[in-house]
A protein has these predicted regions:
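Short alpha-helix capping/helix-loop boundary micro-motifs
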Residues: 13-18, 49-54, 114-125, 159-164, ...
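Short, compositionally biased
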Residues: 42-48, 78-89, 145-166, 185-200
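P-loop NTPase nucleotide-binding/switch module
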Residues: 97-153, 170-229, 244-247, 282-301, ...
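C-terminal amphipathic alpha-helical interaction region
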Residues: 540-589
Length: 589
């Protein structure tokens, strides 16, 4: 018989039940006659506290709350990819069929299509010994992704006593029957459930060794993130957080993208849907949506579901990691998630900490980011979850609690700068405030897969940009004319780096995504120009003479003029620089 409780008090999304209802912490409950989905978040002094994931307007004291004896969970099986869910894994397409354009309260739909038949290849046979994570079946979920159904992590070693034949099955039909060590049997289907707040177990965590290549030069070259890494993208209004995440979602070399729209504008999720349904994945040649799952919990959706959406997304990512895939999560934005925590904390009358955020903000953020990593799974495969979280500090103030606490738990910080964005320099990631702690870990990969000179070139580029920053302090006061020519040259080369390398056009066919070899080639050309120009300056040539030639502007435009698939053209540019060098020498003696 279901456990029940009676509503005693209501405070926005938080409701109180009087007496001992027999509920457990984190248990999923149905609230009121419309069966609104809720979660038990507090048990004390004969009072049960429940947060409701839907609008509570119209609820009244005396109505019934029914327990389910299960934690808030997601259904894991074929059909997740190429789908769009709300914060508690309800498919928005199915909800639209039932309730139209606006989500009705208490709408009940299956998370995944339970009627659809999938072509299944069974990978175990009778008598096989299986353990947690063992792959029991494979299904072609989309053109790009093979879905691997696994023994749940909470089942220890067992024996297969019955295995279905290859064929068509829905996600709930039993395909394998196991005999457990205690003699009981357990039927397994294509789908399984897992609580969203509990990380899926793994065998071993690997140190970072491979970069998540995004095709964005400032990220891949200056501030790389590793597969299984964590990054924060903080920035004020209009600095390009969402656009940066869209670019990473489109072009990163992850196998699967989980895009969580957490408390942001609905039209941004619409843009992702529209773009990804047309874009072709350069790796597979198939549609981007064939490797993407969207979780839409926009700013006008209930605040409690916003808090849950982050955990829903990371649980889906861990499931695909267990199959051996590299998964990247885009969380846009963790600030809205933290605001949801703050609102719920206020409703619960908890003691506020800095700026009204709850005292446990740091532990909640760490619990989220710690679920990233490159792992050896229980079944022996290797997979990764990379988390890239946007942060929206009010007024672009990076000293506020969400940004500061996030910096403690991420190893990559891509700080967006308002002045760069207003100057139309995109991505507006500032090279002086950003950093990556993965560079040392990834150096062996760069040396082996790109060039032994890659990291030294990158360090030289950063040194020039730092010198420019120091010189600009003087230039702002007394102008650049008073500088010696070697410093004028540093400013000119830094301009070439900023405009020709760091600035990137997301709407240009050649520039939207740039392979690592081209990024290295561009660095080499810029530094070769610097080397030759410095040799001329050391011979007494003024920078004004060097600028009479258009070579600096030509090098800035190589990002457009050199196709991504024809890097041989870099040799021509090197010859042009040599010609420029010899011409200046002849002309000026």
């Amino acid at each position: 018989m279901s456990k029940t409780g009676i509503i005693y008090g209501i405070n926005g999304p938080v409701i109180y039940l009087k007496g001992d209802c027999g509920f457990k912490i984190s248990e999923m409950v149905y609230v009121g006659p419309e069966k609104l989905v809720g979660e038990v978040i507090g048990l004390k002094k004969g009072m049960t506290t429940v947060q409701v994931f839907e609008e509570t307007t119209g609820l009244k004291p005396g109505e019934t709350v029914v327990g389910t004896d299960n934690a808030i969970s997601v259904l894991l099986g074929p059909g997740i990819i190429h789908n769009i869910f709300d914060g508690i894994q309800r498919p928005l397409g199915e909800i639209a069929k039932q309730s139209g354009k606006y989500i009705s309260r208490g709408v009940s739909v299956d998370s995944l299509d339970t009627e659809k038949k999938w072509d299944v290849h069974i990978t175990v046979k009778e008598g096989d010994i299986v353990g947690p994570g063992t792959i029991i079946a494979e299904t072609q979920e989309t053109v790009s992704i093979v879905h691997k159904s696994m023994v749940p992590p909470n089942i220890s070693e067992a024996t297969v006593i019955k295995a279905a034949k290859d064929g068509s099955y829905n996600i709930l039909e039993p395909i394998v029957t196991l005999e457990l060590p205690d003699g009981s049997t357990k039927e397994l289907a294509l789908a399984q459930k897992w609580p969203i707040r509990i990380p899926r177990p793994t065998h071993h965590r690997f140190p970072a060794s491979t970069p998540l290549v995004t095709g964005q030069r400032i990220l891949d070259t200056l501030f790389p993130i590793a597969k299984g890494g964590t990054a924060a993208v903080p920035g004020g209004f209009g600095t390009g957080k969402t656009m940066t995440q869209h670019q990473i979602a489109k072009w990163s070399d992850a196998d699967i993208i989980i895009y969580i729209g957490c408390g942001e504008r609905g039209n941004e999720m619409t843009q992702v849907l529209e773009d990804f349904s047309k874009l072709i994945d350069p790796k597979s040649g198939n549609l981007m949506m064939d490797r993407t799952t969207l979780i839409a919990n926009t700013s006008n959706m209930p605040v409690a579901a916003r808090e849950a959406s982050i955990y829903t997304g990371v649980t889906l990512a861990e499931y695909y990691r267990d199959m051996g895939y590299d998964v990247a999560i885009m969380a846009d934005s963790t600030s809205r998630w933290a605001e949801a925590l703050r609102e719920l904390s206020g409703r619960l009358e908890e003691m506020p900490a800095e700026e009204g955020f709850p005292a446990y903000l740091a532990s909640k953020l760490s619990a989220f980011y710690e679920r990233a990593g490159m792992m050896q799974n229980l079944n022996g495969t290797e997979g990764s979850v990379s988390i890239i979280g946007a942060v929206s500090p009010q007024g672009g103030d990076f000293s506020e609690p969400v940004t500061q606490n996030t910096k403690r738990f991420v190893r990559c910080f891509w700080g967006l700068d308002k002045s760069l964005a207003y100057a139309r320099h995109f991505p507006a990631i500032h090279w002086l405030t950003s950093y990556s702690e993965y560079l040392e870990d990834l150096t062996p990969w760069y040396r082996a897969n790109v060039s032994p000179k890659f990291v030294s070139d990158r360090n030289q580029i950063m040194a020039i940009l730092n010198q420019e920053s120091s010189l600009m302090e003087i230039v702002k006061l007394i102008g650049s004319d008073v500088l010696p020519d070697d410093q004028k040259l540093t400013l000119e080369i830094a301009r070439v780096i900023r405009l020709g390398f760091l600035q990137q056009n997301a709407f240009h066919k050649e520039d939207t995504c740039v392979p690592m070899k081209k990024q290295f080639g561009m660095m080499e050309i810029i530094l070769y120009l610097y080397e030759k120009a410095r040799a001329l300056v050391n011979r007494g040539m003024p920078v004004s003479v060097l600028k009479e030639d258009n070579i600096f502007e030509r090098i800035i435009s190589i990002k457009y003029d050199v196709p991504n698939d024809n890097l041989e053209l870099f040799k021509q540019y090197k010859e042009d620089i040599d010609t420029f060098y010899n011409k200046v020498l002849e002309k000026n003696g």
